């Protein structure tokens, strides 16, 4: 390098130590200043150029119009280029004139000139690519300024020393150059305007990060405004920024889907296409399930999707690991402070370098973390989206294998695991790198003794590996328990009403607690192993230090351990400690994530529906539906459900499908939808499809949204759908009209209303083909007739459309075009009604037995038509008596109407319409003003708590852990930190031996005490970890038990108004946080708190001057802490609230996938799910940014601590003990991390303790009456007679609502059979709920056998009554469990009841018999079969009081007749209360109760009621029974 300097005015030396180092006035040689110092910015820019050009080429953000700022920056670049060339020409001029300039005067101007030209071109290229603030160029200009400062000073000092300027030309050009680069740097800090057509210009609340400058991005200053706002008031959702395009779900999910599809393609071989063509009429792309040669790797798909983010994060991490303060410069800086005879400026320079390098490390580290955490958020988002999309395409057999709860677990727990482990991914290579670097520099200081420490690390790795493998085993088992628990809880929440009616809560409670016990045992084992792993890795740095220093002083007596070696080594050991301490967390996280990865991958590899199962194009002319030789099964592993099906349905035909329960009617509809496995044959369906399932699927949204179902509003068509489906009048009594929010699963609608809404959805869709799976079973006979006439029949709005109607209503069959008769999965007969009668087969015999008498009066004429209209009107006005208060005088109005109609009947139909309208109007006028549509909300919105987490929450958790345990943990942590300080002070005293005695004495004693203190610290760490584990698991057990017991005892009204997803969120995510997040957070808080306190104490004790800056730094730290905690806490709460809708929507979607696919609305639901995930991301992204903002600002405080401790050590180096100074500096280098972690863990604690707050909230909700009152038990054998009596009984659904039963008084004799009828919402089901005390009395009493039911426990009551509910609910498990969960009955008893309930043939045909596995909700049984199972339950219990709530609505007439016979014989001496739609089933009952508007309208024998000509007579006449 000296040859570059020449021998002229620059001298002949490139570097001169006497000029630069060993002097009190340091300077650099002129040659160094004009060469390397000037080249540094150029080298940086050229090195960064390839990567930066690659980035600009692939990240076009728009086009920025040429502005004044851009012109100025360009002009400065051009001027700097000119200055460089002027310098170069001046050098050539000197050469020509014989002055022989040094080579550096040619090289430097040439290099700088070319670099300035490059910078100028980059300015314009950035503008064209839409870059508003260039970090690359800002660093370049900053380096130019910094590298020019030293020549700036040197030239002035030289001129002053010489009394003249030696080279006026270069002196002048240099200061012009300095002024220009300073201006360029200042201008580069300003931002350009947003690019044209930038999303930022359209967004009302864009994220400020997008428009932030380089330094703002680097320091996260752009977050400050939100931090201040969050400190001033609780943040709201409207305060949060919009998501950037790159973070939106649809974009992130699509990228992962493409990568996953490539994996599937590679796995299935080149012959398999990744994507199947789109199906006509559908918006989604379904993946075709094909046999695969190998399983696709989801991990590879993730890596390929997020490679760029991983690499960028890795680059930041690599720079941070190699930064000076993290390795040898840390040692060099520290050692310079211990030299009392060197120049003072050495210490000040090294202190400054420590501060600058620490600050750079902070900024780079948090850029790394921001990049990785944003990637982690995107990974979670992508996984949720992929799982959601997969759930829309899985087969029915997969749905039976994976319950809703298990799939929710995949989205909540498993996806979150990926987000939690992502920040540690780079430790896989970074930790070994840091260890290698630390050991390398230890070698430089201690020589081969450093290898002893390496040996310790190598020996401990297999031990920890064995521990981690065992932990993985426990983790897999624990996840299975967790899945089972969440699955069971999901079923309990979905079937909670049935559990209450049957008093089955204890057995399911026992099941949950049994699963929970196994889960906790595995958690405890895993946590113990985690504590052992923590002990190993906490002891590892100490063991390395001990053995390394011990070997060093023992192998050679000449090896002296002085302060410089000890504490430089200790600083390196502390650097070594960071990756080693993080390794247990990494191993634990990777173990858990590997389990989650396998679970997600297994789910994504499950079979999907074949989109080509149903052909949409190739079809016979004139045919809408064709099945040729079709054989179908619900699973490839199961025997066929439908055999040899051959059907051809013409366009516009109305086809009825009939047959007994379980014959395959619903399966045939599913086959047409492509929901079954097609084993043989071909299916063709031409045109769009609308599907009305047997059990209506209703969304948790408004009635209008349920009907429109994603289609644009067409007022005329919408009005027609409501009118024909008899919903118009409902709107007058619903509190919000068609904007009324229908609760989860349509909870606030009756079964009939849900079915009519489902039918209205189909009508509004205006599809070509309508598949109607028994839509008339859930409605009254007159409503069924209206719907058939107005919608389905030959004169209905669907006339001309192709309709396939599954029905048990034989009165509609004559109006169909032809009928398909199914039996045992095969078509036995097919033809027109008259043809089948003439055929004289089984269908004809069935009709002769069950069809109404054709000689009875036909349901035609003016009177009947008007009566039907009034019945519909009454039905509507009686609806929702829990929501509105309609006029109670309906009966009188109806009688008046009937009298007038009788007198007008001869005048013809045309004249009775005005009368009808007039009476309709009069009824509407009599509806009170309380019906005004103010709000239709039923589900209570979940509102985030605000302000500080209440101290009572912390107190509750501390009590759950155990107050003594909590105090003991605090003492253990205080003890272990005191021991750690003692060990380091002892080491400090050890190093002072050399200073005081000139040699080291008692080395073995020193080493022994140091070892003892270290081992004691490790034991205290392990003991504290074990104690925390015991306390945390105790707390988790108590909190879960309290939550479970409270929720299972909550009243039914709570479940009606609270989405199950919200409750399930408490049992899944919040319990997970309490299990696995809260305890480590508390341990980290204790550790960082005591470490920070220890650090301050040691620094103050070592350098008392440090007290001067403690207060200012503490004030700044306090401000940052208060701003951060207030903001992050509220962001965490908002995130928790926004999380529940994701899982609620997912649960809702999974139950309605067949409907969603049938209507082709898959894409709409994807968009809706993405919107809910994006809403959650809007809260998570600021939370991530808040952590980075905190880190930068708090670590700045820590870096100031490092700076001031070093400065004060330099100032007082002549009077301070070198050992204590070394101890002070080594502690100061740790304080940055400990202060940061203290605030972060404190905030994390506040954020995570919210899980306790949320669990406690649902652990203290109002509960039902006690299950058992020991002081007032029911008598043995009660009830004996079954006498039921209501005395002035009134009830409402919830406080503040109107009464649904009003002063009900009636007496039912023991053994009496009573039918209960009335319009929808008249109070029939409410009456039965009151009998079971699902609803508690507002006033009045119910007596059974003279005992007031309100005076005994709920289980004493409910266990002695039996109900067959309207909605048959089964639970996953064996058939035996569903019949006898308590195991009270023998197999013989169960088989006898199955025989009586006509299920024995089906159960006998199953290989497992009574151990036949029912899927969740009983989905692998038909609705009719499920109702038969409910009948079998009733037969087993054989109570004295039996309630039938429309129990045979979904059963064919023949089976219904058999069941009614069974009930008559088996419950002959029991009191039977039957709510019936089919009036023929109660015509032989002792009495019939007619309810109207919650009051008794009629109560007498059927014969007397028909003779009286009242309401019951009208209903019987409609049904053809009078």
UniProtKB/Swiss-Prot annotation:
The modification Phosphoserine is found at residues 902, 905. GO terms for molecular function: ABC-type bile acid transporter activity; ABC-type glutathione S-conjugate transporter activity; ABC-type xenobiotic transporter activity; ATP binding; ATP hydrolysis activity; ATPase-coupled transmembrane transporter activity; glucuronoside transmembrane transporter activity; icosanoid transmembrane transporter activity. SMART domains: AAA (SM00382). One of its GO terms (biological process) is bile acid and bile salt transport. It is found in: Basolateral cell membrane; Basal cell membrane. Residues 310-592, 966-1247 form the ABC transmembrane type-1 domain. Pfam families: ABC_membrane, ABC_tran, TMD0_ABC. Keywords: ATP-binding, Cell membrane, Glycoprotein, Lipid transport, Membrane, Nucleotide-binding, Phosphoprotein, Repeat, Translocase, Transmembrane, Transmembrane helix, Transport. Residues 625-849, 1286-1518 form the ABC transporter domain. It is a multi-pass membrane protein. GO terms for cellular component: basal plasma membrane; basolateral plasma membrane; membrane; plasma membrane. Residues 1-32, 95-99, 154-171, 323-347, 446-448, 553-574, 980-1016, 1102, 1216-1217 are extracellular. The chain crosses the membrane at residues 33-53, 74-94, 100-120, 133-153, 172-192, 302-322, 348-368, 425-445, 449-469, 532-552, 575-595, 959-979, 1017-1037, 1081-1101, 1103-1123, 1195-1215, 1218-1238. CDD domains: ABC_6TM_MRP1_2_3_6_D1_like, ABC_6TM_MRP1_2_3_6_D2_like, ABCC_MRP_domain1, ABCC_MRP_domain2. Expressed in lung, ileum, colon and liver. Higher in liver of Eisai hyperbilirubinemic rats. It comes from the Eukaryota. ATP 2 binds at residues 1318-1325. Its EC number is 7.6.2.-, 7.6.2.2, 7.6.2.3. Induction: Strongly up-regulated under conditions of cholestasis. ATP-dependent transporter of the ATP-binding cassette (ABC) family that binds and hydrolyzes ATP to enable active transport of various substrates including many drugs, toxicants and endogenous compound across cell membranes. Transports glucuronide conjugates such as bilirubin diglucuronide, estradiol-17-beta-o-glucuronide and GSH conjugates such as leukotriene C4 (LTC4). Transports also various bile salts (taurocholate, glycocholate, taurochenodeoxycholate-3-sulfate, taurolithocholate- 3-sulfate). Belongs to the ABC transporter superfamily. ABCC family. Conjugate transporter (TC 3.A.1.208) subfamily. This is ATP-binding cassette sub-family C member 3. It comes from Rattus norvegicus (Rat). The gene is Abcc3.
């Amino acid at each position: 390098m000296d040859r570059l300097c020449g021998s002229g005015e620059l001298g002949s030396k490139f570097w001169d130590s006497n000029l630069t180092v060993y002097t009190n006035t340091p300077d650099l040689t002129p040659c160094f200043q004009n060469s390397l110092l000037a080249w540094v910015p150029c080298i940086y820019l050229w090195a960064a150029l390839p990567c930066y050009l690659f980035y600009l080429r692939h990240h076009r953000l728009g086009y920025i119009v040429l502005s004044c700022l851009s012109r100025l920056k360009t002009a400065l670049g051009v001027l700097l280029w000119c200055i460089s060339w002027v310098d170069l020409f001046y050098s050539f001029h000197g050469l020509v004139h014989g002055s022989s300039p040094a080579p550096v005067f040619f090289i430097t101007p040439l290099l700088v000139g070319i670099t300035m030209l490059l910078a100028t071109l980059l300015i314009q290229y950035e503008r064209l690519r839409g870059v508003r603030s260039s970090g690359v160029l800002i660093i370049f200009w900053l380096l130019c300024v910094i590298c020019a400062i030293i020549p700036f000073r040197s030239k002035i000092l030289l001129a002053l020393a010489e009394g003249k300027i030696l080279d006026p030309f270069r002196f002048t050009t240099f200061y012009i150059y300095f002024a220009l680069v300073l201006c360029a740097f200042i201008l580069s800090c300003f931002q350009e305007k947003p690019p044209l057509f930038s999303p930022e210009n359209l967004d009302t609340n864009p994220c400020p990060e997008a428009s932030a400058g380089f330094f703002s991005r680097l320091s996260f200053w752009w977050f400050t405004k939100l931090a201040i706002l969050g400190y001033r008031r609780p943040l709201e959702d409207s305060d949060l920024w919009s998501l950037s395009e790159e973070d939106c779900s649809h974009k992130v999910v699509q990228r992962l889907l493409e990568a996953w599809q490539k994996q599937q393609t590679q796995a299935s071989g080149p012959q398999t296409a990744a994507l199947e063509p789109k199906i006509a009429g559908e918006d989604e792309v379904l993946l075709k399930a094909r046999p695969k040669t190998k399983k696709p790797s989801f991990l590879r798909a993730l890596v390929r999707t997020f490679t760029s983010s991983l690499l960028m994060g890795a680059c930041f991490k690599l720079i941070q690991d190699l930064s000076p303060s993290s390795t040898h410069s840390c040692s060099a800086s520290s050692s310079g402070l211990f030299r009392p005879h060197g120049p003072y400026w050495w210490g000040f320079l090294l202190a400054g370098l420590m501060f600058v390098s620490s600050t750079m490390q902070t900024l780079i580290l948090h850029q790394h973390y921001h990049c990785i955490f944003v990637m982690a958020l995107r990974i979670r988002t992508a996984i949720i989206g992929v799982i959601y999309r997969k759930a829309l395409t899985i087969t029915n057999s997969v749905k039976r294998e994976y319950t809703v709860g298990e799939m929710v677990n995949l989205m909540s727990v498993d996806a979150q695991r990926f987000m939690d482990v992502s920040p540690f991914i780079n430790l896989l290579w970074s930790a070994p790198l840091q260890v290698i670097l630390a050991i390398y520099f230890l070698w430089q200081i201690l020589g081969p003794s450093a290898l002893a420490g390496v040996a310790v690390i190598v020996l401990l790795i297999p031990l920890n590996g064995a521990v981690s493998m065992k932990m993985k085993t426990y983790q897999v088992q624990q996840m299975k328990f967790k899945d089972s628990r969440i699955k069971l809880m999901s079923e309990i929440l979905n079937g909670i009403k049935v559990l209450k009616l049957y008093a089955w809560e204890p057995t399911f409670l026992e099941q949950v607690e049994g699963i929970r016990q196994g889960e906790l045992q595995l958690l405890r084992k895993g946590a113990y192993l985690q504590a052992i792993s923590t002990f190993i890795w906490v002891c590892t740095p100490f063991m390395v230090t001990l053995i390394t220093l011990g070997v060093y002083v023992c192998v050679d007596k000449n090896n002296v351990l002085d302060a410089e070696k000890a504490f430089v080594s200790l600083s390196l050991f502390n650097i070594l400690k960071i990756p080693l301490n993080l390794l247990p967390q990494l191993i634990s996280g990777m173990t858990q994530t590997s389990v989650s990865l396998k679970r997600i991958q297994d789910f994504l590899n499950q079979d999907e529906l074949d989109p080509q199962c149903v052909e949409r194009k190739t079809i016979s002319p004139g045919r809408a539906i064709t099945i040729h030789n079709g054989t179908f099964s619900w699973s490839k592993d199961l025997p066929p459900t439908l055999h040899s099906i051959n059907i051809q349905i013409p366009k516009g035909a109305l086809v009825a499908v009939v047959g007994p329960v379980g014959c395959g009617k619903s399966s045939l509809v599913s086959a047409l939808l492509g929901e079954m496995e097609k084993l043989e044959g071909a299916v063709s369906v031409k045109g769009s499809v609308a599907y009305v399932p047997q059990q209506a699927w209703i969304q948790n949204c408004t009635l209008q949204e349920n009907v429109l179902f994603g289609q644009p509003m067409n007022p005329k068509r919408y009005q027609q759908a409501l009118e024909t489906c008899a919903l118009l009048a409902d709107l007058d009594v619903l509190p919000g009209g068609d904007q009324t929010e229908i609760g989860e699963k349509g909870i606030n609608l009756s079964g009939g209303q849900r079915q009519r809404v489902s039918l209205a959805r189909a009508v509004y869709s205006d599809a070509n083909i309508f598949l109607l799976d028994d839509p008339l079973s859930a409605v009254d006979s007159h409503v069924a007739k209206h719907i058939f006439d107005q919608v389905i029949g030959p004169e209905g709005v669907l006339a001309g459309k192709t309709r396939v109607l599954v029905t048990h209503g034989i009165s509609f069959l004559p109006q169909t075009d032809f009928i398909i008769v199914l039996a045992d999965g095969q078509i036995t007969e097919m033809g027109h009604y008259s043809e089948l009668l003439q055929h004289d087969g089984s269908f004809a015999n069935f009709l002769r037995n069950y069809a109404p008498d054709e000689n009875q009066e036909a349901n035609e004429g003016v009177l009947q038509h008007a009566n039907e209209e009034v019945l519909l009107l009454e039905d509507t006005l009686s609806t929702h008596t829990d929501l509105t208060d309609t006029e109670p005088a309906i009966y009188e109005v109806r009688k008046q109407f009937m009298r007038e109609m009788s007198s007008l009947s001869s005048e013809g139909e045309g004249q009775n319409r005005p009368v009808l309208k007039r009476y309709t109007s009069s009824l509407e006028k009599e509806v009170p003003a309380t019906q005004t549509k103010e709000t239709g909300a039923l589900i209570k919105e979940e509102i985030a708590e605000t302000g500080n987490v209440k101290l009572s929450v912390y107190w509750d958790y501390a009590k759950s852990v155990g107050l003594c345990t909590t105090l003991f943990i605090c003492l253990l942590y205080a003890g272990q930190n005191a021991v750690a300080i003692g060990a380091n002070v002892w080491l400090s005293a050890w190093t002072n031996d050399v200073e005081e005695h000139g040699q080291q004495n008692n080395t073995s004693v020193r080493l022994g005490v140091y070892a003892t203190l270290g081992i004691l610290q490790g034991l205290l760490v392990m003991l504290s970890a074990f104690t925390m584990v015991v306390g945390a698991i105790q707390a988790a057990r108590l909190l879960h038990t309290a939550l479970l017991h409270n929720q299972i005892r909550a009243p039914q009204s709570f479940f009606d108004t609270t989405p199950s997803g919200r409750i399930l969120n408490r049992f899944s995510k919040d319990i997970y946080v309490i299990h696995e997040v809260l305890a480590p957070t508390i341990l980290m808080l204790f550790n960082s708190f005591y470490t920070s306190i220890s650090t301050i104490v040691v620094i103050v004790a070592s350098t008392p001057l440090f007290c001067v800056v403690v207060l200012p730094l503490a004030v700044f730290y306090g401000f940052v802490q208060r701003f951060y905690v207030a903001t992050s806490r509220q962001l965490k709460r908002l995130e928790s609230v926004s999380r529940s809708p994701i899982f609620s929507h997912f649960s809702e979607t999974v139950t309605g996938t067949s409907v969603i696919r049938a209507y082709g609305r898959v894409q709409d639901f994807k968009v809706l799910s993405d919107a809910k995930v994006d809403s959650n991301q809007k809260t998570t992204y600021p939370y991530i940014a808040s952590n980075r903002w905190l880190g930068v600002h708090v670590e700045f405080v820590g870096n100031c601590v490092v700076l001031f401790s070093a400065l004060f050590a330099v100032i007082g180096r002549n009077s301070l003990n070198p050992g204590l100074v070394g101890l002070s500096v080594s502690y100061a280098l740790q304080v940055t991390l400990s202060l940061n972690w203290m605030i972060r863990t404190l905030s994390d604690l506040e954020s995570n303790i919210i899980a306790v707050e949320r669990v406690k909230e649902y652990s203290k909700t109002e509960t039902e009456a006690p299950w058992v009152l020991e002081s007032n038990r029911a008598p043995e054998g009660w009830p004996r007679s079954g006498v039921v009596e209501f005395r002035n009984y009134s009830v409402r659904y919830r406080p503040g609502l109107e009464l649904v039963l009003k002063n009900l008084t009636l007496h039912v004799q023991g053994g009496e059979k009573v039918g209960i009828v009335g319009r929808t919402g008249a109070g029939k089901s409410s009456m039965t709920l009151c009998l079971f005390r699902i609803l508690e009395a507002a006033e009045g009493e119910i007596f059974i056998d003279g005992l007031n039911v309100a005076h005994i426990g709920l289980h004493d009551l409910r266990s002695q009554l039996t109900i067959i509910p309207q909605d048959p609910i089964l639970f996953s498990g064996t058939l035996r469990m569903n019949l006898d969960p308590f195991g009270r009955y023998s197999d013989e008893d169960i088989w006898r009841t199955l025989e009586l309930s006509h299920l024995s043939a089906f159960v006998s045909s199953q290989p497992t018999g009574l151990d036949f596995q029912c899927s969740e909700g009983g989905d692998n049984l038909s609705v009719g079969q499920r109702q038969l199972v409910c009948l079998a339950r009733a037969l087993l219990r054989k109570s004295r009081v039996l309630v039938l709530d429309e129990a045979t609505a979904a059963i064919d007439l023949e089976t219904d007749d058999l069941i009614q016979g069974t009930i008559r014989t088996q419950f002959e001496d029991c009191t039977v209360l039957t709510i019936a739609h089919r009036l023929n089933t109660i015509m032989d009952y002792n009495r019939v109760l007619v309810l109207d508007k919650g009051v008794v309208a009629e109560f007498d024998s059927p014969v007397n009621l028909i003779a009286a000509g009242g309401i019951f007579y009208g209903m019987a006449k409609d049904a053809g029974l009078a």
